[in-house]
Regions:
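AMP-forming adenylation/ATP pyrophosphatase catalytic core
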Residues: 2-40, 63, 95, 116, ...
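Core alpha/beta nucleotide-donor-binding catalytic domains of modification enzymes
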Residues: 2-216
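Repeat-unit-sized solenoid/scaffold elements
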Residues: 126, 210-218, 474-484
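Hydrophobic/aromatic-lined pockets within catalytic cores
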Residues: 151, 219, 278-282
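Contiguous mid-protein beta-loop-alpha structural module that forms a pocket-lining wall or clamp
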Residues: 172, 177-264, 268-276, 321
């Protein structure tokens, strides 16, 4: 029996084949290559051997991060010789990892290496039009990941460990259910050497501490500890699928939409729903638990509160919960300090499109042949109609700015007298975090607010039966309104 046949019949190869079939990791009939993340360690070396034996077209990818001096160069030389031996194409990348980390604020050396590695893999994935990128994580790696996550506090997603497949098949882990014992036995029979990272013995590194100090204690409790945890991981994967199905079928698809507190309190596992809907806000579990406790109090539920997360805020407002990301908060801050003078009124007939931090403004002028229907024309809250000829006579100096002055008064069309701007914003359910950034059209000569975008307009320059030309100013927001209003703000009689 040839060595190849011996290796093909090895338990490692059988386990890899089962894993590939069970999770549908690879298309056996495809001629597209598989990118192998090859470090030169035992795991990735066995992975390359196994997939090559199973007949897949492999391209190896090796990164030299220059973090371990001569050892890094030794690894590169080893994988070069290995790929020559197996007749596998090798793609290499050399990185100044320390330089990358220092050039990117807040990025550790470990994070830098990860970003550089996956950027390189992604580039190869596109260049080769590859089936996928195969990673060498094995069963023991997954057990260690579970223990690390458990020590930090984790839910189902953290305790089910690494998945066999992620990013819709872009990354796969054919060894994820394979014991390292099989890996070492396979390499022994293949008479295949491998390299060892000297830092793997450093127990000041968290994963190494788990591997060398903590894991052996569990093995004393149960010699089949890895297999026991593997069974638990499979159960947790199923539970995660059930949880994801429940969340997906219960929550709105758009995470910018508000959650009604009364509705949330009636649901199963409301904390899990909060975690999912406001995932981009990155709120601590204790913060979300406090939020739920506050929502259980009917008096508090209707009042305003703000809950901080690492990625933004959640606001409790008028019986709803609304999330705003840090990116959106930054845009709102920019809009608060933004002021834009509109072009001279005489130039409006040519049309204009202007940029704003929260959207875009389009100005158009129409003549009587394009007038609204004789009875009623309804516009969105983001459109403003004015009599163009009245405007030309008055010649106001118009600008768009933020509603930062809470003491300002506005005379809305259809209402008696003047109303405080702050009250109009409250009545329109504008979130407190967004009020100061609400766009308004102001006549600089008189200080009059002509249009509070998305809320109301004044009676100035409104259309009449005598109107011959009219201008339409449209604000197209790029920031969705969580309390989208469908009020018909503009009703024009003819």
């Amino acid at each position: 029996m040839s060595q190849r046949r011996t290796l093909l019949n090895h338990a490692l190869v059988h386990q890899m084949r089962r894993t590939i079939e069970q999770y549908d990791l690879l298309d056996r009939q495809s001629q597209r290559v598989v990118i192998i993340a090859l470090s030169g360690g035992a795991d990735s070396t066995a992975l390359l051997w196994g997939l090559s034996l199973l007949g897949y077209r492999c391209v190896a990818a090796h990164c030299n991060f220059h973090l371990r001096g001569e050892e890094s160069d030794r690894d590169e030389a080893f994988v070069t010789e290995l790929c020559n031996q197996l007749g596998v194409t090798l793609e290499r990348a050399s990185f100044d990892t320390y330089g990358y980390a220092s050039a990117h604020k807040g990025v550790s050396v470990e994070m830098a290496a990860r970003e550089l590695r996956y950027d390189f893999f992604d580039e190869l994935y596109v260049r080769y039009d590859a089936q996928c990128i195969a990673l060498g994580h094995h069963l023991e790696d997954n057990v260690e990941q579970l223990l690390i996550n458990l020590s930090q506090g984790a839910g189902v997603r953290g305790l089910r460990g690494m998945l066999p497949i992620r990013e819709e098949g872009k990354y796969i882990r054919p060894l994820i259910d394979t014991s390292p014992r099989l890996i070492y036995d396979f390499l022994r029979i293949a008479e295949q050497p491998f390299v060892t990272d000297s830092t793997n013995a450093d127990t000041t590194i968290r994963r190494n501490f788990v591997r060398h100090t903590l894991r052996p204690l569990f093995d004393q409790l149960n010699p089949s500890f890895d297999q026991a945890v593997a069974s638990t991981i499979h159960i947790l994967r199923d539970l995660e699928q059930l949880q994801d199905y429940y969340i997906k079928s219960t929550l709105p698809a758009d995470d910018s939409l508000p959650l009604e507190i009364v509705w949330l309190r009636q649901q199963i596992a409301p904390l899990a729903l909060l975690y999912s809907h406001f995932a981009a806000i990155y709120c601590d579990r204790l913060v979300l638990q406090q939020l739920l406790m506050d929502c259980s109090n009917s008096e508090r539920a209707d009042s305003y509160a703000r809950y901080e997360g690492r990625g933004g805020i959640i606001e409790r407002y008028r019986g709803y919960l609304i999330g705003t990301t840090s990116e959106t908060l930054a845009r709102l801050e920019q809009a608060t300090n933004f002021c834009l003078e509109l072009p001279a009124i005489e130039s409006w007939q040519a049309g204009a499109v202007l940029d704003h931090p929260l959207g875009s403004i389009e100005i158009a002028v129409h003549d009587s042949s394009e007038m609204p229907p004789p009875a009623i024309r309804t516009l969105t809250p983001y459109s403003y109609l004015v009599d163009y000829d009245q405007l030309r006579v008055a010649m106001p100096q118009l600008q768009l700015s933020a509603s930062t002055d809470g003491e300002q008064w506005v005379a809305p069309l259809g209402m008696k007298g003047r109303k405080p701007l702050a009250k109009l914003l409250r009545d329109a359910k504008v979130l407190p975090s967004r009020r100061a950034a609400t766009v308004q059209l102001i006549d600089n000569h008189t200080g009059t607010t002509l249009w509070l975008v998305g809320v109301c307009r004044s009676a100035d320059y409104q259309l009449t039966p005598q109107t011959r030309r009219w201008a339409e100013i449209t604000f197209t927001p790029t920031l969705s309104d969580p309390f989208a209003r469908h009020t018909e703000l503009h009703t024009v009689a003819r």
